[in-house]
Amino acid sequence: MIFVTVGTQPNGFLRCLQEVEMLIGKYGITEEIVAQIGNTDFETNKFTTIRFTGENEFKKYIKNASVVISHAGSGALFNSIKAGKKVIAMARLHEFNEMADNHQIELVKKLSDGGYIIDGTYSLVEAWPKLEGFVPRNNDFKCEIVPVLDRWISAWMEQEGRRRSEERRVGKECRSRWSPYH
């Protein structure tokens, strides 16, 4: 099974899904394809689509995949690399209004240069043949980088949660002090 994930950005990722359709036509792919399409307005009869998945279901799709075609979100990429999968990553591009900036290109380049993934940012059709013989570098990655990033993201989320809690508390105090009804 080939698992495709485009993430959950509000603007969808049509370019990636259209390229998957082109892959099927050009390379005669008959393997089952399941695509998590998020908010993308897209219909096809060439493969199975699902809008969203929970975390456990998402990881199960990755585990069962022979290949993962992914947007360049760090969570999707790191989960796929950690699972030892062959990954083709397509960064969302600012020039196509897929993202506010081009930060995903940097992540794809770093991971591709390191031998963890294949860069398919500009063309999945051109990236597909690179899968043959590709052995993803992953042992050192899953042992060192992922736990560090997990800790960093968890700490940031905890700090952000405390900040927002404090903003709500202060906002309530200000509203109650300055209310004309008190």
Provide a role label for each language-model segment:
Residues 1-164, 169:
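Nucleotide-activated sugar donor-binding and catalytic core shared by glycosyltransferases
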